[in-house]
């Protein structure tokens, strides 16, 4: 029963993704006025991406599909911008989820996943090199290939072990209050929208990686079509 439910969640997420926002910096951009409707749309867009990621086997493939569907880059292909020379020891909980002892070597990889000029997520990744092929290890150590693409031959599946929202576009009590009057300001969006912690498994259900993915406001970097209800504001 789980796969049909996941497919329905993904289909619903991709349909909802058609509602759209705009640009980064400190405000979301001219396409995102700070209005009640805009906040409802932002909520739908963020939650649709969240649902698509939770239902997916590969965050890399999902983000590439998001970038392509929203025309965010001429070549919608994800690239991992590596932060080289950094290390972060795995916690005992991570080692337990990966089914490795305290002396088993783990490798750490921190990347920013970008589509064109848009950094869509930041990822901290701990993986067990002995459970990958030599070629996979070489690719991960020497190239900017996203992790999901590098290990795709393992028949990867994901199990989410934690999810945390970092932004709620609608104010507390919005469902019981009258909507505020629209204004000519732009919607302020924080740097980070939500994060997931997931364990990756081979096709034989052997855990080989744990990743913490934090999704940024750049996922909203696409053109939001004007709405009839948008306030008539002077051009900046």
Describe the predicted segments one by one.
Residues 2-12:
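Bacterial N-terminal signal peptides that target proteins for export
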Residues 2-3, 16, 50, 77:
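Low-complexity, intrinsically disordered short peptide segments enriched in small/polar/basic residues
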Residues 6, 23-26:
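Intrinsically disordered, low-complexity segments enriched in proline/serine/threonine
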Residues 11-21:
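Bacterial N-terminal signal peptides
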Residues 26-108, 112-114, 118-179, 184-194, ...:
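N-terminal domain-onset segments
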């Amino acid at each position: 029963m789980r796969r049909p439910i996941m497919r329905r969640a993904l289909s619903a997420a991709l349909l909802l993704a058609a509602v759209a926002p705009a640009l980064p910096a400190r405000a979301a951009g001219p396409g995102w006025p700070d209005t009640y409707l805009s906040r409802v749309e932002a909520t739908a867009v963020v939650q649709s991406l969240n649902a698509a990621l939770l239902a997916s086997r590969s965050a890399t493939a999902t983000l590439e599909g998001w970038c392509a569907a929203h025309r965010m880059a001429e070549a919608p292909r994800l690239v991992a911008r590596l932060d080289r020379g950094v290390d972060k020891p795995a916690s005992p909980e991570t080692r337990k989820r990966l089914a490795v002892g305290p002396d088993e070597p783990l490798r750490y990889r921190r990347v920013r996943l970008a589509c064109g000029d848009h950094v869509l997520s930041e990822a901290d990744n701990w993986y067990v090199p002995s459970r990958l092929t030599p070629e996979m290890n070489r690719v991960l150590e020497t190239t900017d290939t996203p992790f999901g693409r590098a290990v795709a031959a393992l028949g990867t599946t994901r199990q989410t072990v934690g999810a945390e929202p970092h932004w709620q576009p609608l104010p507390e009590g919005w469902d019981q209050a009258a909507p505020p009057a629209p204004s000519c300001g732009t919607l302020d969006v924080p740097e980070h929208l939500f994060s997931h912690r997931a364990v990756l498994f081979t096709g034989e259900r052997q855990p080989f990686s744990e990743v913490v993915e934090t999704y940024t406001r750049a996922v909203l970097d696409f053109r939001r079509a004007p709405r009839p209800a948008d306030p008539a504001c002077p051009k900046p």
